[in-house]
Amino acid sequence: MKTILSTQTVDIPDNVDVTLKGRTVSVKGPRGVLRREFNHINLELRLLGKKQKKLRVDKWWGNRKELATVRTICSHVQNMIKGVTLGFRYKMRSVYAHFPINVVIQETGSLVEIRNFLGEKYIRRVRMRPGVNCALSAAQKDELVLEGNDIELVSNSAALIQQATTVKNKDIRKFLDGIYVSEKGTVVEPES
């Protein structure tokens, strides 16, 4: 059965500006600008109100799968708003049983070098996604901190680091060495 109209709105905070150009959404906030295209999805995007502080997403005559995209677009825009106001921070911890993993940050936080993984001489190099900054934690030993405005780029960079330290040809229940995400949060603490 087709639903005639499915609608959802996203509230825009006062310190954030959202502009629409076709189905391209630009979100500008205190931490920077994020831009995302939704041209591949057949939806209507519209800013509401005199001050344009609401974004409405409409889908006409959609089946179940097409109606699900309405909430998906709203979630993406909410993540963009959260990114330009608070920013995203992922913390990663090195886990090792015997050989200590040495992590070196190169090129001012855009390249991570992983040495001595399982005692190997091979140096693993992982480049961060654009807009993601990586640093070693001063307070905690064996901890990496990834920060950025785009949640997808930050989480993808964390995934690349984790995948670089996968154990090959061994029983992974026994060989638990690697660098894993230990905490997900925001750079700026939200006021509750």
Swiss-Prot record:
Lipid biosynthesis keyword on record: no
Subcellular location: Cytoplasm
Disulfide bond residue pairs: none
Keywords (A to Z) from UniProt: Cytoplasm, Ribonucleoprotein, Ribosomal protein
Pfam families given in the database record: Ribosomal_L6 (PF00347)
GO molecular function, one term: structural constituent of ribosome
InterPro entries: Ribosomal_uL6-like, Ribosomal_uL6-like_a/b-dom_sf, Ribosomal_uL6_a/b-dom, Ribosomal_uL6_CS2
Highest taxon, organism lineage: Eukaryota
Keyword Ribonucleoprotein appears in the UniProt entry: yes
Cellular component aspect of the GO annotation: cytosolic large ribosomal subunit
GO term, biological process aspect, one: cytoplasmic translation
Assembly and interaction partners: Component of the large ribosomal subunit.
Family designation: Belongs to the universal ribosomal protein uL6 family.
Purpose: Component of the large ribosomal subunit. The ribosome is a large ribonucleoprotein complex responsible for the synthesis of proteins in the cell.
UniProt protein name: Large ribosomal subunit protein uL6
Taxonomic placement: Eukaryota, Metazoa, Chordata, Craniata, Vertebrata
Gene symbol of the encoding locus: rpl9
